[in-house]
Amino acid sequence: PGTQLTMRTFHVGGAASRAAAADGVDSRNAGTIREHNVKTVVNREKQRVAVTRTGEIGVIDAQGRERERYKIPYGAIVLVKEGDAVKAGQRLGKWDAHTHPIITEIAGQIRFQDFEDGVTIARETDDVTGVQTMVITDPKTRGSAGKDLKPVIALFDAHGKPVNFAGTEIPAAYALPPKAIVSLEDEGEVQVGDVIARIPQESAKSRDITGGLPRVADL
């Protein structure tokens, strides 16, 4: 039994690390879902969006043993919930393999702060779709005037007052790291679970993206 346990633990760990580079995770066995530290918000499509970085989903067999467990990255769409019966091969969660999203947990009107064309942001147009996005520039490449600017997306209510994160006195504002991609319009409306910005995987790997996000204590 000792050898078996070691092998299984290793296998689960391997599966979790492989899943991180994929665009989702599937159950290997039939069983019942058990969630570990999974915190979600429900988006406008009625999907559960993970807003923790430490959440995991396990699959329990009929004897109550956890047969497998997977890390669920921040921003993933969680397709199952605690107590659900799942089949072998069923998809448990999915995410964008190429970018890390910044998710809003608060609804409101967004306002861009320190967004300056050609200084803190560069505008790019997709050749195929024609959709224009803004990319946050690296402070190292900015002139002296832009070095101290910190692009932020802040949230306000219908009366133009800043909204706070739920249960806190902290204004809801999301600091954007270099290379973050923004597809929203200034003064547009966002709902809970919407993507505020996306950070390309390669730039996210090179720095701790939680440093640019609020609510770190909750994650």
For every predicted segment, state its role.
Residues 1-219:
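Intrinsically disordered, low-complexity regulatory segments
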